[in-house]
Amino acid sequence: MEPSVDANSITITVEGMTCISCVRTIEQQIGKVNGVHHIKVSLEEKSATIIYDPKLQTPKTLQEAIDDMGFDALLHNANPLPVLTNTVFLTVTAPLTLPWDHIQSTLLKTKGVTGVKISPQQRSAVVTIIPSVVSASQIVELVPDLSLDMGTQEKKSGACEEHSTPQAGEVMLKMKVEGMTCHSCTSTIEGKVGKLQGVQRIKVSLDNQEATIVFQPHLITAEEIKKQIEAVGFPAFIKKQPKYLKLGAIDVERLKNTPVKSSEGSQQKSPSYPSDSTTMFTIEGMHCKSCVSNIESALSTLQYVSSIVVSLENRSAIVKYNASLVTPEMLRKAIEAISPGQYRVSIASEVESTASSPSSSSLQKMPLNIVSQPLTQEAVININGMTCNSCVQSIEGVISKKPGVKSIHVSLANSTGTIEFDPLLTSPETLREAIEDMGFDAALPDMKEPLVVIAQPSLETPLLPSSNELENVMTSVQNKCYIQVSGMTCASCVANIERNLRREEGIYSVLVALMAGKAEVRYNPAVIQPRVIAEFIRELGFGAMVMENAGEGNGILELVVRGMTCASCVHKIESTLTKHKGIFYCSVALATNKAHIKYDPEIIGPRDIIHTIGSLGFEASLVKKDRSANHLDHKREIKQWRGSFLVSLFFCIPVMGLMVYMMVMDHHLATLHHNQNMSNEEMINMHSAMFLERQILPGLSIMNLLSLLLCLPVQFCGGWYFYIQAYKALKHKTANMDVLIVLATTIAFAYSLVILLVAMFERAKVNPITFFDTPPMLFVFIALGRWLEHIAKGKTSEALAKLISLQATEATIVTLNSENLLLSEEQVDVELVQRGDIIKVVPGGKFPVDGRVIEGHSMVDESLITGEAMPVAKKPGSTVIAGSINQNGSLLIRATHVGADTTLSQIVKLVEEAQTSKAPIQQFADKLSGYFVPFIVLVSIVTLLVWIIIGFQNFEIVETYFPGYNRSISRTETIIRFAFQASITVLCIACPCSLGLATPTAVMVGTGVGAQNGILIKGGEPLEMAHKVKVVVFDKTGTITHGTPVVNQVKVLVESNKISRNKILAIVGTAESNSEHPLGAAVTKYCKKELDTETLGTCTDFQVVPGCGISCKVTNIEGLLHKSNLKIEENNIKNASLVQIDAINEQSSTSSSMIIDAHLSNAVNTQQYKVLIGNREWMIRNGLVISNDVDESMIEHERRGRTAVLVTIDDELCGLIAIADTVKPEAELAVHILKSMGLEVVLMTGDNSKTARSIASQVGITKVFAEVLPSHKVAKVKQLQEEGKRVAMVGDGINDSPALAMANVGIAIGTGTDVAIEAADVVLIRNDLLDVVASIDLSRKTVKRIRINFVFALIYNLVGIPIAAGVFLPIGLVLQPWMGSAAMAASSVSVVLSSLFLKLYRKPTYDNYELHPRSHTGQRSPSEISVHVGIDDTSRNSPRLGLLDRIVNYSRASINSLLSDKRSLNSVVTSEPDKHSLLVGDFREDDDTTL
């Protein structure tokens, strides 16, 4: 039956649907339209897929029909897809009861029938149907008088059905599926998706972690399939866009029916093939393991192919087949026809089997005889976890029995296994899995060397075509590339990228650095290119960009080489090093004894280079770099300004003495003038008679000469730094504070010098009045201010300096043997540590690099990095952070991140960037400062001119208020001096520094204090924005809750003399130990803790049924119970909450403990228990009856938001376990504090509304958005922002990244050092919700301090400048220039000191708030909570349900929360942390949660 196309399919986007009723309305109305065969509407996808007759309808008419119903229909793609139709042959098997016309009319009215041809003479009908809409059996049911013509059907379609060939219009989809751990997972996915309508075939590969699905796009979409896989509990990603299949029925018919023909143009017959032959094909166009799987699965379905092995590395396939049925040419065409039709196939070799004896001439034509000369391969597998020779013997004994394994040798010292095997019977991956199944970690090597092909020698023919050809084909080259990765938020993202990239063909190793946002990938350039790798990362949902030059010379080494005497030594070192593999460049300078080397750290390390130079007879050592934080504590600047101040002070003291002397003498003369009525001439003579006023030369007095001599060194030595900075500013066409200072002092000095020279030139008898006293006093106060300012600035960076000081300077590298015994220790510089080194850290020592503990137990102080006050326990497998301090035990760690890639280095970089970033308010201050200096200069000039005018118009004002005025000076000179004094004072008192320091100093202290408390604030903008926040939105899972389920209660449902509680825990823990579900892991963890053991019994026949539960058989638990001592048993009984259904007293329970005596017999030790664990439905399926008491207990747990599961042992209901994701202890307090701060608190989650309501009631949140998809969280945050509210989003950074980025302030909570760098504005290193309160509180305190600083700065300038300009002269308020400089210095110092008050900040802690009464905290009743479901704002207030409705809803919620595949398609939530729907209960209603 060859398919034809008589129908089309179109997908139309439909907007405006709100509920299932809309879906049904559209389906009913459009389904009635003439020419529409089938319609499927998806509310979630907002689309309608319609199959229609193109002769009667068009996409445009269908779009208009939906528009007419009141919905918005959009046609994005007007090109319809053809829909497959089949032909059904019907014959009359009995006398007709209906006329042929009636039969034809009935069939044509049937949906899915596109044509009917009636043949009354042949008493038959040919009906064209759409098989996806209607089936042949349904057609027969419509017309009972007709029956299927089976002979015709078999004749037409037998071949197609037999081989399940793809049909026209079918689409093949490849999806990456994560989280699969065993074949049970693959069976679950195949069973779930295979039942979906429109899915034709599905094949799930555990090795490749992918699923290949063939489906009909008009019935189901790729997105729906993806969500169904995620509903089972496995994250899925569409790997490639779906493609239509090309291999049709005709291809398989050609394979089966094509006769054996000689090649075109061949003059002789092709050789006769024996019954069993093998041929090797060369295949071009394969890219990954998916291609290998595709070819193997396609050919293995053919009857005449007995086996096929495809090698991606060798680009070849070895096919074993029945030569009497098929030829190599037919197989070649079959491979080329396999979808996607990209393979180019050629026959590499044709051979005969040993079943016949080929002639010598035949053999000469065959280059490779694989059957008569058995082909084998050798694989080397890395095996970790072996501890002794018993492990070696165990592996060799088991693997040697596997089919196809010829020999195996396992090396304990090298942790490898070398296996020789037959590739036709097994593969390296199968052998690796077999070793892993034994409990060892097995991995295939990074493909540095190809598999070794081994064969038996042959006398007739050579085994391989040629060694050169084989070497060319199988040589593998490794390159390295760096890719910048954005969007990573935590360690889960890192693991996701590394795990998925390693699966891609041609990629050898991947190392991703979270903090640096960089991935280092080693790959085979013949197989894959960096841009393709970047595309793979983008397909995983991250941003990726190839770093072009990152890999070039990424290792740079500076060495001091001693012992060189001439140029010959230089040449010897350079030539020797450049010959080494991995060294790109080497330059040695004899004059400086330094060597500059660029190298590849993957190939050679710095210690290797130093050793090589040492072997040449020279001594090489690392150039010491300054790792101190001197640049942060401003020591250099402090020393500089202290020197400037002391120089200025040394010369200023005599100047001030002279000034004071002259002021006293002038006051004395003024008193004499007033008391004795002296004339002006007498006053002048008396003034000139003073010692300091005596003239050495005409016009040059002693006073002016001393002032000049004292002013010169201050002006040009003490003020040198000011001149340098002012020159640089003017050079770049800007003006700053230094320009004002230089202007003021230079004008005063220049004016004084010029007027003095003029007086000397004119031989004046009256000494001119100079300003030589002004520069020394100005520089003294300004230098003092700068000195104090830099001391204060050093304090602002104290936090960052502390972080930098944490970095270790040396590391102890150890060498271990194969038994992990210490061979040697070596103390090296921390810069010489290489990735993969084993480092020993003694008690009290600092961890030099990030790493993973491989041996030892200790407590580690991470307080200065994470803010966590309590030491953290470390054991093998734990990660450690560079800079943290080891406390009480020696540890061996393996370096994972070194140098600038360590977490500490990245945090230091982050804090440095934050302290140098500008807040919006600072940008305003900077803009203001840009206009400030020109404005002050203008004011100074205006002040000068105005006072000159006023002085000449009304001299009495100047005479009255000018300090030190005496009549010996002329009026003009007095006016000019007074005007200059006011002008210079304006220049001195104006201070843009205070404006410029107001924000950055506060930001530096604020971010530093935050870093010390485990709060990383990324710059001034989020620090300023956080205080404006009005709404705080919390994610649920991992933020409000812990994100991991725990056991809340265990109820024993049988008498304790039948089975004890400990025995139930031992059996349940053993059964759940094989489960990968988080609920199972929680139960296992609880059982191990209660039994105080790390090992459990044996579990066999383990089966998991998604949506229900598990079943298995458990043995070997009596020995486990025997090891439990009496003290642990008594503590368990005391602490556990045991609820007995059939009452039995406590004494009886204790006395009948099931602890087994030491003389247990072997028969008892091997007792087997049949175990069932699951929900109600699972128990009912297995024929168990649930009593009302048990049912009520489950309902009560479900009401509190817990998941309740039942336990059956040997067909008897024994226990009930309640499991929940617990709320963090500080969550309720944090919400209460935020509300008391005037903030609105909202809970947003992808979980169901019932769970969300339960969580909200416990922590006191009254507004909830439930069942919100991750993509909709962004829309919800935006919606709150459109209401005029500033939003802070708090999430764990896994699926909340888009919402964190959209919020005004994104706050990411990290666990330990897993910090969300990219998405969030604020990163909380500790997993503590009170840090959310602290971050907002710190922001408020910092912004308040910034405002206080601005008040200080503005007061000085707005009040000081008018005073200096003489505006308040009429009321007697006037300033000298030195007073202005003192005020200016005080303004800068006061601003910095004000910022330093932030160092007194103490973040709120749990204990602090617990001391205060919390009468307003506590739970909210359900009626107080407003729950909004989905993206719309439909609020669900507390429902009022009857008893029966409550039971039904709670039961359904329990089943749905336990296993998500019972949900409808529209309720599937793609949020990974919420996918288990772990409900959190109220732990305060009673005490039954005590275990």
Curated annotation (Swiss-Prot):
Cu(+) 1 binds at T18, C19, C22. Widely expressed. Highly expressed in pituitary endocrine cells. Expressed in melanocytes (at protein level). Expressed in motor neuron (at protein level). Expressed in hippocampal neuron (at protein level). In the kidney, it is detected in the proximal and distal tubules (at protein level). Expressed in aorta (at protein level). Cu(+) 5 binds at C490, C493. One of its GO terms (biological process) is norepinephrine biosynthetic process. ATP binds at E1072. It is an enzyme of class 7 (translocase). GO terms for molecular function: ATP binding; ATP hydrolysis activity; copper ion binding; copper ion transmembrane transporter activity; copper-dependent protein binding; cuprous ion binding; P-type divalent copper transporter activity; P-type monovalent copper transporter activity. ATP-driven copper (Cu(+)) ion pump that plays an important role in intracellular copper ion homeostasis. Within a catalytic cycle, acquires Cu(+) ion from donor protein on the cytoplasmic side of the membrane and delivers it to acceptor protein on the lumenal side. The transfer of Cu(+) ion across the membrane is coupled to ATP hydrolysis and is associated with a transient phosphorylation that shifts the pump conformation from inward-facing to outward-facing state. This is Copper-transporting ATPase 1. The gene is Atp7a.
